[in-house]
């Protein structure tokens, strides 16, 4: 009986491994393809410029990422 349980266990393990195969999500591209890298860099630069806002004195401050909250914030400041 123990032999039968062992075989069932091994078959279940093999079936489990055969169902879950490792595959890359994106097809690999050649490392010499610098056109895509340039495109990605341009997009990152454009998005980072969208997030920046200049103040009156010329300093760059982050516009949407600035937190206006006072620490600890919330309705009850003595909560924590």
Swiss-Prot record:
Any one cellular-component term (Gene Ontology): apoplast
Kindly list every residue the record annotates as glycosylated.
Answer: 75
Put simply, this protein is called: CLAVATA3/ESR (CLE)-related protein 4
Does Transmembrane appear among the keywords? no
Biological process terms from the Gene Ontology for this record are: cell-cell signaling involved in cell fate commitment; regulation of meristem growth
The ranges of region (Disordered) come to 55-80
List of residues that carry Hydroxyproline: 72, 75
The family line of this record is:
Belongs to the CLV3/ESR signal peptide family.
Q: Which organism is it from?
A: Arabidopsis thaliana
- Cleavable signal peptide: 1-22
Task: Keywords in alphabetical order, please.
Answer: Developmental protein, Differentiation, Glycoprotein, Hydroxylation, Secreted, Signal
Identify the taxonomic lineage of the organism of origin.
Eukaryota, Viridiplantae, Streptophyta, Embryophyta, Tracheophyta
């Amino acid at each position: 009986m123990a032999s039968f349980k062992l075989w069932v266990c091994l078959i279940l393990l093999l079936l489990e491994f055969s169902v879950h195969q490792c595959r890359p999500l994106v097809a690999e591209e050649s490392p010499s393809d610098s056109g895509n890298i340039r495109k990605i860099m341009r997009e990152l630069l454009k998005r980072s410029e969208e997030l920046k806002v200049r103040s009156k004195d010329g300093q760059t401050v982050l516009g949407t990422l600035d937190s206006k909250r006072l620490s600890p914030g919330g309705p009850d400041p003595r909560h924590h």
